[in-house]
Regions:
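Nucleotide/phosphate-binding catalytic cleft detector across ATP-hydrolyzing
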Residues: 1-25, 32-37, 45-197
């Protein structure tokens, strides 16, 4: 199977600060020492992934819009929120919104709720692309900023998305080809691919 880098598979994370009215773009990337200590998280990892320090590992804890490593995702989100919103006060960061573009099941949604609570949110609101009453063609960024009108106490939002969805498509097709080969359906797979051309 074609090799994919953590940068290609990682989710893009956008953090919206409703107080300052600023949006920050991040990547779901982490670099850990093999002892378990996190070296860094987010965009800072991109340049380091190809020349990792000795005894360290780099990967994405959120892949294809889903949490693939809960503990690392929690540490990553804590660091990102602290970086952009400051250290949480005694009561935490207040109310947070999680906006996800992927279709998730209940268990996957709960993982995101738990992540935000563990990262310091006092309350968590969930939204996805099925939000009602949005005029067609409205950019998702405007929708997320506008959620403050519905949820007055929102302090921040975390959007899980993918700026280059073609990376996900390439990965999914490579996975499908690999599975078809394993299942003895390689010929059928190739036939279907030819039909699509």
């Amino acid at each position: 199977m074609e090799k994919f880098t953590p940068s290609e598979l990682c989710a893009d994370i956008k953090i919206y600060d409703y107080k300052k009215k600023v949006k920050y773009d991040e990547k779901s990337l982490v670099i850990f020492e093999k002892t378990g200590k996190m070296i860094t998280a987010g965009k800072e990892c991109e340049g380091m992934l190809y020349a990792l320090p000795a005894n360290s590992i780099g990967f994405s804890p959120i892949v294809l819009g889903r949490v693939s490593d809960y503990t690392c995702a929690e540490k990553m989100l804590k660091q990102m929120l602290c970086r952009y919103l400051g250290k949480p006060v005694f009561a935490g960061y207040g109310e947070g919104l999680i906006f996800i573009h992927e279709k998730l099941n209940e268990v996957e949604m709960k993982a995101y709720f738990d992540l935000l609570y563990q990262a310091g949110a006092k309350n968590v609101v969930y939204a996805d692309e099925s939000v009602k009453g949005i005029p067609e063609g409205t950019p998702w960024e405007d929708v997320i900023w506008g959620m403050k009108n519905t949820y007055k106490n929102l302090r921040f939002a975390v959007e899980i998305t993918k700026e280059q969805p073609m990376d996900y498509l390439r990965y999914s097709l490579a996975q499908l080809a690999e599975n078809c080969k394993r299942w003895g359906l390689e010929e059928e797979y190739n036939k279907r691919v030819m039909e699509m051309k």
